Regions:
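Hydrophobic faces of well-ordered beta-strands that scaffold small-molecule active sites
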Residues: 16-22, 41-43, 69-73, 92-94
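Glycine-rich, proline-tolerant flexible connector loops at the mouths of alpha/beta enzymes
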Residues: 29-57
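Conserved anion-binding
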Residues: 79, 91-127
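Glycine-enriched alpha-helix->loop->beta-strand junction motifs that scaffold or abut catalytic
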Residues: 36-40, 86-91, 111-112
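N-terminal amphipathic alpha-helix/helix-capping segment at the start of soluble metabolic enzymes
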Residues: 1-19, 23
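Active-site beta-loop-alpha junctions enriched in small/polar residues
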Residues: 23-25, 46-48, 74-76, 97, ...
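Short, acidic/polar
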Residues: 22-35, 75-83
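Alpha-helix-loop-beta-strand connector modules within alpha/beta enzyme cores
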Residues: 52-78, 82-86, 110-115
Length: 127
C-alpha cells in the first residue's frame, strides 16, 4: 500500500508528485482519478460538495488503486482535521494558514499527545 510517507520521500528526493483534485462526491469518479502515474488524489471538502460519508468512501476508492488519498479540510479546526485522518486521509491540506500559530495548531491537530492534540478514534484503521 502506498502511504503518505511515499509523498514525503518523493519530495525529499527532489521529485515532483502528480496529483488530482476531486470536488464532486463520487467514489467512482475518485477511483477513476487514481490512475497509473498519479501520486495522490486530494478530496476537496473546503470548496467541493463532499461530506464525511463521501470522504470515507472516496478515500477507500483512491487507496484501493494504490494512490495516496489526501483531503483539503473546510477549516483549520482540530476536530475537522482529526476526523479527516480518521476517515482514511493520509494527509491534509489545511486552508487559511496565515500565521505561525495557525500552522502550529494544524500540525498539533494531526499528532497524538504528547506531540499534539489529536484524539484517538481511528475508525478506518480499526477495520
Amino acid at each position: 500500500m502506498v502511504t503518505g510517507k511515499f509523498l514525503r520521500e518523493q519530495w525529499a528526493a527532489g521529485n515532483a508528485a502528480l496529483g488530482l483534485w476531486a470536488a464532486v462526491p463520487s467514489a467512482f469518479a475518485a477511483e477513476l482519478m487514481a490512475i497509473d502515474g498519479v501520486s495522490y488524489v486530494c478530496v476537496d471538502q473546503q470548496h467541493g460538495v463532499i461530506d464525511y460519508a463521501d470522504l470515507v468512501e472516496m478515500t477507500r476508492a483512491i487507496e484501493g488503486r494504490g494512490v495516496v488519498p489526501i483531503t483539503r479540510v473546510p477549516a483549520n479546526a482540530a476536530w475537522l482535521i482529526g476526523r479527516a485522518l480518521d476517515a482514511g486521509a493520509q494527509g491534509v491540506v489545511v486552508p487559511l494558514i496565515n500565521t505561525a500559530a495557525d500552522a502550529a495548531a494544524a500540525v498539533a491537530a494531526c499528532r497524538y499527545p504528547p506531540a499534539g492534540v489529536r484524539s484517538f478514534g481511528p475508525i478506518r484503521a480499526a477495520l
